[in-house]
Amino acid sequence: MANSVMATEQLCYIPCNFCNIILAVNVPCSSLFDIVTVRCGHCTNLWSVNMAAALQSLSRPNFQATNYAVPEYGSSSRSHTKIPSRISTRTITEQRIVNRPPEKRQRVPSAYNQFIKEEIQRIKANNPDISHREAFSTAAKNWAHFPHIHFGLMLESNKQAKIA
């Protein structure tokens, strides 16, 4: 964390809990003991950061609980966002829990896609000078002209379909 005594903002380094990028965040001095919302510019993850806990964890990484006098900044209407004067590691871990979107599963390729892929490889193996576009066009025509292969009924001996 950068030390700036008379500045109106404090530069803080906050790790994104989704993509693990370290973000340089300018926090107004009046919000240094509040919970602030941070958006990652890399993954656009949005989460709340307890600034007092973040500041304290940077200065004392192995603390269990600390009596910490929280100075009053702002009006009494914002006092509901102030943190208690006793902070524990449990509070910090609760702040870092994030709802991550489900991982995208790799789907099994369709019979058509699998056939086209294999057919293009076969066509290019037989004729290396053919363009990918021509090989794709030929593979699509082969798919249309050989309906028995759509259902996986193609025998190994018939696997070498003729180029249309």
Curated annotation (Swiss-Prot):
InterPro entries: HMG_box_dom_sf (IPR036910), YABBY (IPR006780), YABBY_C (IPR056775), YABBY_N (IPR056776)
Phenotype when the gene is knocked out: Leaves polarity and growth defects.
Disulphide bridges, residue numbers: none
Molecular function, one GO term: zinc ion binding
Pfam families, per database record: YABBY, YABBY_N
Main localisation: nucleus
Transmembrane spans: none
Keywords from the named record: DNA-binding, Metal-binding, Nucleus, Zinc, Zinc-finger
Location in the cell: Nucleus
Function in brief: Promotes adaxial cell identity. Regulates the initiation of embryonic shoot apical meristem (SAM) development.
Assembly and binders: Binds to LUG and LUH; these complexes promote adaxial cell identity in leaves as well as embryonic shoot apical meristem (SAM) initiation and postembryonic SAM maintenance. Interacts with SPL/NZZ and SPEAR2.
Name listed for the protein in its UniProt record: Axial regulator YABBY 5
Protein species of origin: Arabidopsis thaliana
